[in-house]
Amino acid sequence: MTIPISEQIEIIKRGCSELLLEDELEQKLAQNRPLRIKAGFDPTAPDLHLGHTVLLNKMRHLQDLGHHALFLIGDFTGMIGDPSGKNTTRPPLSREQVAENAKSYQDQVFRILKPEQTEVVFNSAWMDRLNAADLIKLAATHTVARMLERDDFGKRYQSNKPIAIHEFLYPLIQGYDSVALRADIELGGTDQKFNLLMGRELQKHFGQASQCVITMPLLEGLDGVNKMSKSAGNYIGITESPGNMFGKLMSISDELMWRYIELLSFEPLRVVRQWQQDVGNGRNPRDIKVLFAQEIVTRFHSRQDAEAALADFESRFRRGGIPDDLPENILQAGKEGLPIAQLLKQTGLTASTTEALRMIEQGGVKLNGEKVSDKTFRLSCGQMVIVQVGKRKFARVTICEEK
């Protein structure tokens, strides 16, 4: 059954920040053919977290509508380093690092994308064939003034911070990727808008129909404030154990839950709207959070793993009388981690480290429902825990890297 274009547009726009241009997309959809959907990933971080999957989820939505995904691994651009949103020059990766990280990407993306509707491509396939003259011709299509329109370049120029010449090539090469792939739509984060529009301009320059651009928001981490990232310690990795994944999802605030559902859930919009109506009529948001956490764990593991994670969570937490609205704490730690006694003092669960050590000796401290007996225990960056002292004191704590 053919889905009306208006309904397709609604599905495509779900959760997106911007769609450029909607009338052009309607014209492409009216051609009634599989569109070529491009999203590029520089293999700088081999392990994906849920923040990375926002783009992949949108690609999956488009696949469900019958379109073809072009999962572009920027092995060539990865050796340049994308400067988007950065105030300093990023060091390039070696070809060996890029190859190793690219393999890890391929092992993970098919947990979301349909393999039969996905083409994994590497931009070195066409970029390695360009000679010096070709690159100079590509660079000649745009001016330095145009490049300085990009926010991060402009700020660095105004503050006299260095901009390497090769960094100007990055948006040009990303744009040329769209030419090489004849992309109909390109997806990217809001911080990539300049580069995505570069693809439209270069396609027009090379006599192609310009791609539509869909920008997706950057997913907030567990703290609900900063972008999800490993360095901030507020992430959920897609290869984490079912129990860790489930527990972290259950730890997010009720407000953040709706944001995660909008960007990460595959449940139909009518179902999500019904959930919102139910909560408005008095249903406990925790019930919805359980359904959402089970969906995500099932996607990256299995239904059986999700059910086991729920059972474990209920046995350790819900029967332990943990309140719904736990205070949120974001604590910093160095490479050695944060000592448990310092954590208890900094969160105010104990008045001093001496009291903290005494409570541990007495068996009155739990992390994620498990009793702590080691007074020298340290929590590492990236950990998210629910801490309990005695029967009535609780806190939710995220450990991030010391700045």
Curated annotation (Swiss-Prot):
PROSITE patterns, sorted: AA_TRNA_LIGASE_I, S4
Main location class: cytoplasm
GO cellular component: cytosol
GO-annotated biological processes: tyrosyl-tRNA aminoacylation
Alphabetical list of Gene3D superfamilies matching this protein: HUPs, RNA-binding S4 domain, Tyrosyl-Transfer RNA Synthetase
UniProt organism field: Nitrosospira multiformis (strain ATCC 25196 / NCIMB 11849 / C 71)
Family to which this protein belongs: Belongs to the class-I aminoacyl-tRNA synthetase family. TyrS type 2 subfamily.
UniProt GO MF annotations: ATP binding; RNA binding; tyrosine-tRNA ligase activity
Organism ancestry: Bacteria, Pseudomonadati, Pseudomonadota, Betaproteobacteria, Nitrosomonadales
Catalysed conversion reaction: tRNA(Tyr) + L-tyrosine + ATP = L-tyrosyl-tRNA(Tyr) + AMP + diphosphate + H(+)
Protein known as: Tyrosine--tRNA ligase
Alphabetical UniProt keywords: Aminoacyl-tRNA synthetase, ATP-binding, Cytoplasm, Ligase, Nucleotide-binding, Protein biosynthesis, RNA-binding
